[in-house]
Design a protein with these regions (language model features):
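Extracellular adhesion/carbohydrate-recognition regions
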Residues: 1-36, 79-82, 100-104, 111-116
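An exposed tryptophan-centered "aromatic clamp" motif
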Residues: 21-35, 41-93
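Extracellular structured ligand-interaction cores
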Residues: 65, 98-100
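Structured loops at beta-to-helix junctions and adjacent beta-edge loops in soluble globular domains
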Residues: 14, 70-71, 86, 104-106
Length: 116
């Protein structure tokens, strides 16, 4: 898997091409190994470039589509924040919708990772 380091996080460089429910996206992240998880909505927003669109992203690996965050809505725990990298818009949707997952892990986990 190709990755890129941005602001103390290691990001998947590309999604795997599969849209999943939130539950299945969380499971997918754990299959990647040590420390991998879904990003928070704040982490996803940090890579949005609002001066461009399709994709609205500061880096080249963003597909212009919806991606899951790990951030639940404060008013309704059935809803999760998602981001659309086509325009950088942020909203929430139900957990059973199917979106892409772009996983991250902290740099500390990368430094502590031992190849087997």
């Amino acid at each position: 898997m190709k990755t890129i380091i941005i602001d103390n996080l290691e990001w998947q460089e590309e999604n795997d091409g599969n849209r999943r429910s939130l539950r299945d996206s969380i499971i997918y992240a754990t299959t990647l190994g040590d420390g991998w998880r879904l990003p928070t909505i704040e982490e996803l927003i940090s890579i949005v470039d609002y001066n461009t669109y399709s994709p609205a992203c500061k880096i080249d690996f963003c597909c212009p589509s919806h991606y899951w965050s790990s951030s639940l809505s404060a008013s309704n725990s059935s809803l999760v924040w998602v981001i659309n990298f086509c325009y950088g818009d942020v909203n929430f949707n139900y957990k059973d919708e199917h979106y892409y997952a772009r996983c991250v892990r902290p740099i500390a986990d990368v430094k502590n990772f031992k190849r087997r």
